[in-house]
Amino acid sequence: MGNVVHDSFRVMSPFNAYRETEFMSDSLPAKPAENSVDLTFLARKPSFLECDDAAAFLHGMKFEANTEVLWFILKNSQGRYFCAEFVEPNALKVDNDGDPADDALFVSMCSRGRLCVPVGYTVAASFHSHPPADQGLQESSAEWSYRNRFFTCYDLWKVINTRRSYSRCYLSTGKDGLISYNSNASDFERELSRHLAKKTDGSSRLFQSLYERGGIPASIWMLLAIGAGELKMVVKGIVKDAMWSRRGALEASWKWDIDPNQVKSSSVELMPIFSPVFSDVAGIAACLRIRRRDSFAEQSAGVILKHNFRDEFIATAAEPCDYVNFDLAVVFPKDQHGNVQLPEGFRVYGFYHSSKPSLPDLLPPSDAERFENFFSPVDMKVSFDRLVAAPQHHVLMLTPDNAVLSFSQPDIPVRSLIVELTQDFQHKVISGEITTQMFVDKVAAAGNLSVLLPSKTWPDVGRIRPSVEVVTVIAERAE
């Protein structure tokens, strides 16, 4: 299950190469997104703040189409979460006690019929993705679609039966989003589990058998699940006809909620999805580059947080939006007093955003490639305004050619440059009155402009220094 790697990678898998159970994550390799990169990274045992974050990371992986996928999310004694692939028993190396080696981070089924997990971890949740089921003879297209976008009876039975090993499960439906079910051990749930349990001969009971053949409407099964436990949309769908386009709890009124004619609530219910925990901002930069959207048709932005007392960094998942309109309230919920809520112990370190695609007629006559792979004058002004209000913050930008640029520590020239950027500065660059290099020099002279991850346009990692001419002009103005 979970065929996301080729056999060659299975042989070379580094799952057994890390004996220490540290909960900090190493920096990601600076490579474009691909499953081998994700798997190599997961072999390093990256930790996540919440179970939802780990599930969302798995949801972002590109699994082989039309295959059964099963992973588990583990929790360690420090309360951090980790991703672990399910490995069939015949492919698992175990010690003399029948348990997997304590340096391995995968889950298997032991001979005694229980889940085997690495020492120091417990199972927090299962993660599933299923191939499409065949449509039933009397099943409508709508109900068939619902059935292919919801948990199977067996998925939920595993978390609601009295002998369960974990009480939460996730289902990835690709571009239709990620949903979760959390058991609340209700009387209704216990009664439902009796009707989902296998018969003594191992065969399915009538309800499950009918449902799997399309004989029971999926919408009825969904209502039963909603009444039994806690269902929520963890990652919303990104396709036009996604069943759920809003994160949050799924209620019995879910059909009404997905009606395109209904007015959607704009309030944020849940904490945003966060990246793994990193020990430095370079790890965040690499993660953003690997997990960036495949399409550059729209701009996206997010927030970077740092722990108040430890070198721990996390970033929110990218939110499609214009950077100029982005702020904390876009992704974070508010308390009863209207204050933005952050994870306990964390503060805002800065913001990140991708570039906004430029139309061909809005490019300068020369050095257009550098202009496209740099902060736009409009976005730069937004960042300057933020940094004047909070000088301790940092701004990261992901360029189209996969560089990650950073600006921080604003200096005195920032205020004068803000004024200059409001006076149709972009038109002057496009017309050639101001060259792209002059714009880069002005920004470099106004603070710490750096390349965190290189690209063709920005091949050298480190601080970008302004030219001598720009420095001289600024010094004369200061006098």
Model-identified regions with their sequence ranges:
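Glycine-rich short-loop/terminal segments
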Residues: G2-T122, S204-G345, Q437-E479
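Active-site-proximal loop/helix of nucleotide/amide-processing enzymes and allied scaffolds
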Residues: F106-A252, W256, V331-E479
